[in-house]
Amino acid sequence: MLLASLIALLAGATGPLGLRTQGTLRELFLDVTAADARPLARPELDLRWSLANDWNEPMQLARHDDRALQYLDEQADSLTASYRAPWPRLPWIWTAVEGRLTEHWGGWSDRPIEAWHRLTGAFNYQREAFPRDQLRLLYADSGGVAFDLRSARLAVGDLVARTQATVLQGAPGAVALRFDLKAPTGLLSRLGGSGGFDLGGGVLGTVLLAPWAALHGLVALSHFGELSAPTRLQPKPWHWSFEGSLALSFGETVVLIEDRCLSPLLPPGWQRLPGGGDDGILSSGLYAGFRVHNQVSAGVRRGRFAVWASEDFTPGPNPHSTIQWIWVSNAPDFVLGLSFTQPL
């Protein structure tokens, strides 16, 4: 019992944040999230709030005779509840059930983001040419309309079940296998979910570098179902993701630095129709939908509470920008979050 309590204490204190990659389109699908590879000693309830500001100006796409329109401008505030517990007779396996409510609205975060851009001299992605704190979400093409929102909506999200089994464990760390499943309980028209089933699997590792440092990793492969709308532009069926998390303990405070990288959401073959020059390309959803997405996060955990912030910076060629070795998708542009975890 003492050993189990110690494992729970260490895993809870130095485990990764378990973040998903937010954003209007990515949130519709399953995201295999990181976790400590060591067993879970007791049930726990995790409650979290997060804010994601998305900004992609109107974009027109073409593939042969097909045409598509995208416009993603919102603040999404999410409340997520997750209950996870070890199996009674197989304590090295745990299962979690996760549900989410999201308010899609104009929010308040546009002005602080623009102020930060002015302060740092960063490119403002043509935000100043559009109304602040507005909601406008459109995904449509020659085949149909997936969503078209002009006013705030509260959306019930898809239900997610996650099961993880520790297969190797020793003094320096552990290795675990994971299987996740998403069921379509949310409505696509309200941006609650994709309207289809998704599944994913992954390998997780945890290494104790020192009594005050832990390193976590995740490699995952997922299969996405199609959007429930008859749009021509559908997600790629297969997706990979990589994630790394470094947890550094300073007394009762844990500082976390994380990086997660996801494959492109949408398939190749579509071209953005010209307009707006280089600034128009950078401000559109081209990179968000058709390129790899890399999210960098920093967080602090103390006791049962954790706070974090995330930005997307993806290394790679970007000839349309003055900084040509990195790109930013702005989907989301910025994320803030707060979580409370209660052992049961």
Question: How would you label these PLM feature ranges?
Answer:
Residues L45-W49, T95-V97, T163, V175-F179, ...:
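Membrane-embedded beta-strand positions of outer-membrane beta-barrel proteins
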Residues W49-E57, G99-W105, D158, V167, ...:
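Transmembrane beta-strands of outer-membrane beta-barrel pores
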Residues L28, P43, Q75-A81, G157-T163, ...:
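Hydrophobic, lipid-facing positions within transmembrane beta-strands of outer-membrane proteins
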Residues M59, H117-F147, P230-L344:
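Outer membrane beta-barrel transmembrane domains
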Residues R100-W238, L286-A288:
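Outer-membrane pore/translocation modules
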Residues L40-R42, P88-I93, T102, L168-P172, ...:
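Outer-membrane beta-barrel channels and translocator barrels
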Residues L6-R48:
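Outer-membrane beta-barrel biogenesis signature
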